[in-house]
Amino acid sequence: MAVDNSTSDAHTPGRQLTVVDIAIIAVYFALNVAVGIWSSCRASRNTVRGYFLAGRDMTWWPIGASLFASSEGSGLFIGLAGSGAAGGLAVAGFEWNATYVLLALAWVFVPIYLSSEIVTMPEYMQKRYGGQRIRMYLSVLSLLLSVFTKISIDLYAGALFVHICLGWNFYLSTVIMLAITALYTIAGGLTAVIYTDALQTLVMVAGAVILTIKAFEQIGGYEQLAEAYAQAVPSRTISNTTCHVPRADAMHMFRDPYTADLPWTGMTFGLTIMAAWYWCTDQVIVQRSLSARDLNHAKGGSILASYLKMLPMGLMVMPGMISRVLFPDDVGCVVPAECLRACGAEIGCSNIAYPKLVMELMPTGLRGLMVAVMMAALMSSLTSIFNSSSTLFTMDIWRRLRPRAGERELLLVGRLVIVVLVGVSVAWIPVLQGSNGGQLFIYMQSVTSSLAPPVTAVFVLGIFWRRANEQGAFWGLMAGLAVGATRLVLEFLHPAPPCGHPDTRPPILHGVHYLHFAVALFLLSGAVVVAGSLLTPHPQGVQIQSLTWWTLAQDLPLGVKTGDGRASQRHAFWARVCGVNAILLMCVNIFFYTYFA
């Protein structure tokens, strides 16, 4: 039964965008398309290497900006702020954990990939293990994950933001943003994607900083956040329940390993396994590092991205918490009828925390800037995923089906596959709307925890254990897929109960946190890989040479001409600079973890 504790009508009409706001949005889009067209014109787009890897001539700063922007799509803006509103600071651990795996990408994985001379991640798997079935499986799995955890989420989040801010039809908003995003992605390849990502990063950070300052002004500063958040209770609640009460551990990063929503054990071990898949083996991310002109630029890009990944705690998570403080009846609603009124979803409305803050706090002009920021986030993420997914399909699937396909055919297929991915993703949006208690970010991580750990296990063992072979790797992937897919299907068949209802889900769902499940799935898959490899013949020499950490090629592209002593000294100097920055970065990361622990 719902209980109404309000003393007045708390639901006033929201503010709307003005002509000035819309003009700023239009100017931003014009600038964005201009950057895309400029980079497309200067790019080498008529070869597969130029279209998919930007000619391998990118410097560190656009790589770092693109790594950050690619991971900070509108789904993450809305998802992180929404999870912050629902549960507090701990969700920022998903961002801070990236520091260590980004450094692993640059110092461990990229040298392996450069040594193996590959374009896609499944291509590396084929070279390392031999055969075609692992490469084909990983290509298909990557495309499915792109649809279920990336494209559909970003489309939903971006359309939700535009729907709330502009009042446009939800699916009309989706189509318009897709059309603009696909325009320069299809035209310009990876070069256009990386340069527009650099612009998006600047806009995203600037706009988010302004909103964060405005939000803290409303509650009296950071010192007031903990007390204000603890009192952010909606006026209408469900009797005899506590789901409307903010978490007591909301201001802590490390939480109870048994009862917490984000246990510290899962955030330390399970998250690292999932993050290693995303940052070190996922095509969307690795493709940016492979476009670097040399190893130092790849390292510099990872370091810049790692520094930027420290920002979302203050720019997304805390503003989400403040949004619940300011608008508890909308962002913190628990009564289904109230949630339906506030955001159109009965399960909860934490996803509207960020757009609600934008529309209610930002003055005219800046409101338009923030809508542009969210569109920038959407387009940055989508352009990255579109380009990388088309690379996967073209290089790993189409060339297998059509081995004699020419450059023109491959480029055409790469562009057409984007259209197909978009159609499937739009069709999936209604499914994810009601998933995982209305928390978009948790839905994304939950799906990843069921499918990604086996891939991480196969990559890690392939790089560090020379004895791993094709039979062990394939059956490790199949065992992991069987177990992970079973849990995933159960999650869709048995969604989390709404507030006030008993939890009747199977024990594997309510008794095993998805982050802990990721650890178990990783260990299971790894054990099958080891057992299968030991019971079958050793891999051939061609599957080891230049393809493992212990057999790296000695002539990695360092950007130094043979015999150029001065260039060699410069390279060594910048290598030391990268090393010092990596150590400093880890110190900063540990300090923040300790401060908020």
Swiss-Prot record:
Q: What is the membrane topology noted in the UniProt record heading this document?
A: Multi-pass membrane protein
**Glycosylated where?**
N5, N97
Tell whether Nucleotide-binding is among the UniProt keywords. no
Note the PROSITE patterns from the entry.
Answer: NA_SOLUT_SYMP_2 (PS00457), NA_SOLUT_SYMP_3 (PS50283)
Q: Which residues lie on this side of the membrane: Extracellular?
A: 1-16, 95-100, 163-174, 223-265, 323-367, 432-444, 494-514
Q: Where are the transmembrane segments?
A: 17-37, 74-94, 101-121, 140-162, 175-195, 202-222, 266-286, 302-322, 368-388, 411-431, 445-465, 473-493, 515-535, 577-597
User: Which Pfam family is one of this chain's hits?
Assistant: SSF
For this protein, what reaction is catalysed? D-mannose(out) + Na(+)(out) = D-mannose(in) + Na(+)(in); D-fructopyranose(out) + Na(+)(out) = D-fructopyranose(in) + Na(+)(in)
| Keywords, comma-separated and alphabetical | Cell membrane, Glycoprotein, Ion transport, Membrane, Sodium, Sodium transport, Sugar transport, Transmembrane, Transmembrane helix, Transport
UniProt GO molecular function: D-glucose:sodium symporter activity; fructose:sodium symporter activity; mannose:sodium symporter activity
User: From what superkingdom does this record's organism come?
Assistant: Eukaryota
Expression across tissues is: Predominantyl expressed in kidney. Also detected at very low levels in testes, skeletal muscle, and spleen.
Q: Which residues lie on this side of the membrane: Cytoplasmic?
A: 38-73, 122-139, 196-201, 287-301, 389-410, 466-472, 536-576
Q: Which GO terms describe its cellular component?
A: apical plasma membrane; plasma membrane
Question: Does the entry feature the keyword Oxidoreductase, yes or no?
Answer: no
Subcellular localization, per the record?
Apical cell membrane
| Function according to Swiss-Prot or TrEMBL | Electrogenic Na+-coupled sugar symporter that actively transports D-mannose or D-fructose at the plasma membrane, with a Na+ to sugar coupling ratio of 1:1. Transporter activity is driven by a transmembrane Na+ electrochemical gradient set by the Na+/K+ pump. Exclusively recognizes sugar substrates having a pyranose ring with an axial hydroxyl group on carbon 2. Has likely evolved to enable renal reabsorption of D-mannose, an important constituent of oligosaccharide chains of glycoproteins.
**Family the entry assigns:** Belongs to the sodium:solute symporter (SSF) (TC 2.A.21) family.
Q: NCBIfam families under this entry?
A: sss
Q: What is this protein called?
A: Sodium/mannose cotransporter SLC5A10
Organism field: Bos taurus (Bovine)
